[in-house]
């Protein structure tokens, strides 16, 4: 069962990247990494806490699926008890376009939360997803009811 949920979560990230989405990883509300599609390849950017660019890399030959698996594995291997970069290990995942919104029902948020807690109940305790339609962060831990956004 967990494998199906893991695959669903990877598919969610993969679909976003395939549709020219941008994936941002944030720590304490600060963007520290970005993965974007730039025509032929994906680019990986890293930033410091002032949002100064400190590194960039062309991910030549990478597919949206490889990247999705890498992101999933990175999240899974950094539980909340570990330090991620510097400071409080709060990870947010940002989907730039509206791919997962259906009738303003926040499908992206509900699916991502449901899948995440099915993989590991405590993995996303302090993690959240950016909703582009209502432009705010929703903590996974407060999305307890499937009816919350209906």
Swiss-Prot record:
Give any GO molecular function from the UniProt entry.
metal ion binding
Report whether Metal-binding shows up as a keyword of the record.
yes
User: How many cofactors are bound and how?
Assistant: Binds 1 Zn(2+) ion.
Top-level taxon of origin: Viruses
Q: Does the keyword Glycosyltransferase apply?
A: no
Factors inducing expression: Expressed in the early phase of the viral replicative cycle.
Q: What are the record keywords, sorted?
A: Early protein, Metal-binding
Q: Which cofactor does it need?
A: Zn(2+)
Q: How does it assemble?
A: Monomer. Homodimer. Interacts with protein B119L. Interacts with membrane protein E248R.
Biological role: May participate in a redox cascade for the formation of disulfide bonds in viral proteins.
Q: Which family does it belong to?
A: Belongs to the asfivirus A151R family.
Report the protein name in the record. Protein A151R
């Amino acid at each position: 069962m967990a494998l199906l949920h893991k695959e669903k979560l990877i598919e969610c990230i993969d679909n976003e990247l395939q549709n020219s989405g941008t994936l941002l990883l944030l720590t304490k509300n600060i963007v520290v990494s970005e993965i974007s599609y730039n025509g032929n390849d994906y680019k990986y950017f890293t930033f410091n806490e002032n949002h100064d660019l400190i590194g960039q890399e062309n991910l030549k030959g990478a597919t949206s699926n490889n990247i999705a698996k890498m992101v999933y594995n990175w999240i899974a291997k950094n539980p909340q008890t570990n330090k991620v970069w510097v400071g409080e290990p709060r990870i947010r995942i940002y989907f730039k376009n509206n791919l997962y919104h259906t009738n303003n029902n926040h499908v992206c948020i509900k699916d991502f939360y449901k899948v995440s807690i099915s993989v590991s109940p405590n993995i996303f305790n302090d993690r959240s997803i950016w909703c582009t339609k209502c432009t705010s962060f929703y903590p996974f831990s407060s999305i307890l009811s499937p009816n919350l956004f209906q």
